[in-house]
Amino acid sequence: SGDWSGCEAVAITGGRLSTASGRVQLAVPDAERREMMQSAARSAGTKALLYVTGGSNALQGKSAETAAALAQAVEDGGYDGLYLDLPQLADNRRTALTETVAALREKLGEKLLYVTAEAPAWQGKTYSAYDYAALAASADRLVLRVAPYQKTADGFTVAPLEPMEEVYCALAELKDTVPAGKLSLLLTTAGSQWKNGKRVSNPNSGEIAELLADEKNTESYYSSRYACAYLVQKAQGNTVTVWYLDRQAAEARRQMCAFFGVDQICLSSLDAVSQQLLEGLR
């Protein structure tokens, strides 16, 4: 849960799309949890969306059948719309996603339709599975997920969340393809914790606050290069590094979005979010 006031929509997790023997299968959140979350959302004056994710077999059925199953779940569950998040789609699913989202637009009518797309990559892998213009034409919002950046130099892990270079390049790449009012930037509200060069956990704001409170063993920093906060804790022979978005980092990303005319930011979770991060978005 969390404070949802000021949010346009809240996505209720628990939906999962898959295909077995050509048949579309859709798991949805249980009724008790759904009703509790919908009630909280409406009390805050925000829309409640059904959040649906899926793996590599999510779009192997017919697009019309997939869209029909998703739209029916939205209707049956009394949701205000759908948030479809199919991460790192293979290139051969491009047409299926475009067709499914177009069919969803028709079936959902006035209900909200949010779709996540991997941002065009500046470094490394480029995702060509997303027809950004076509998806944005059908969806109310195209939510961009920016790839994390990870490297180790001299034993120190550099792993900023939603790196600014990547954010800039993604928005610059899409500015002539997708109307700014259709875009939203996804920000990770949890941190990224590393030990001995390996990612070990995703601490929430409370856990990060605990580490910062250990002033004897913890130093906090802000990387202007990546516009991201990080802390280093050295205790009992171990070194732990946590990268996270604080007020300054959130504000930098909000300003970058504003520069490109993008007026919405999507938070990965309100359970893990810090007041600092929220302040940076105001």
Could you tell me what each predicted segment is?
Residues K234-R282:
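Extracellular low-complexity, Gly/Ser/Thr-rich intrinsically disordered linkers
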Residues S1-A64:
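Glycan-recognition patch characteristic of GH18 chitinases/ENGases
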Residues S1-G6, Q60-D76, G124-A134, L245-A258:
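Short, acidic/polar
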Residues G14, A67-A96, R141-G155, C266:
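Active-site groove signature of glycoside hydrolases
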Residues E8-I12, T46-V52, L82-L84, L113-A117, ...:
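Hydrophobic faces of well-ordered beta-strands that scaffold small-molecule active sites
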Residues K182-R253:
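Glycan-binding loop/region signatures in secreted carbohydrate-active enzymes
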Residues A20-P29, D91-A213:
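Substrate-binding surface in catalytic domains of secreted glycosidases
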Residues G2-R23, L70-L84, R253-S268:
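Catalytic domains of carbohydrate-active enzymes, especially glycoside hydrolases
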